[in-house]
Amino acid sequence: MSARFCKIAMDLRAFAYLPSRLPFVSVTDGTLTPMATGYLRYPDVHGDLVVFTADDDVWLVPVTGGRASRLTNDHVMVRNPRFSPNGTKIAWTSYLGQRPEVFVIDLATGDQRRLTWLGAARSFVVGWQDDEHVVFSSPHQTNDVGLAWLYTVSLDGHVERLGYGPGMDLAVSSDGAVAVVTPNSGDCSRWKRYRGGTAAQIWLRPARAEKF
């Protein structure tokens, strides 16, 4: 059984993945709980909740399964929903304005806001730097749509480029270690097992170190 879009909860107690068309949630004792049928993508886990995309909207469901709640009602392409570290907000990429932009929702109030107005051909939410800043990847400051850089956008819409160079994904551990994935030449169907010069690379910087 193959798996795609794997995401591990921050407390390491659970992870979600999509084997073919049926998404499962696995807890650390190995129990697999089927969530629902349908074309579901991009799961992310926080505590006892899983967020995912389906039917051109963002949905929320308990880790234990049950009725999923639709968080958006826009019926446009969405991808990469990500919980904030404290679990109170979710950021995602939405094509509501024809171009991919960063949106955020407050789970307590249901308030949904658009954070970026960049107009780039590609722009994908990566995660959160902290509870106030969303990390995303975008080529909006280059003339090459395939050359994306990593940015943060604050909850009031202020965008800053991170100093890691070109990148499409980022992970920062609690002790400050950093992993950056450089842009690749296309989707995985084109670069799977590819070892040429345009293959993506993973750069690692240990905690308290200055160089990758």
Q: What residues fall within each predicted segment?
A:
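A short helix->beta-strand "capping" segment at the edge of beta-propeller domains
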Residues: F24-G38, A68
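Beta-strand-rich domains and repeat architectures in extracellular enzymes and scaffolds
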Residues: L32-V61, R79-N80
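Short coil/turn segments that connect the beta-strands within blades of beta-propeller domains
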Residues: G47-D48, N86-T88, D131-H133, D175-A177
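A flexible loop/linker signature enriched in serine peptidases of the S9 family
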Residues: T53-W59, N73-V78, T93-F103, D111, ...
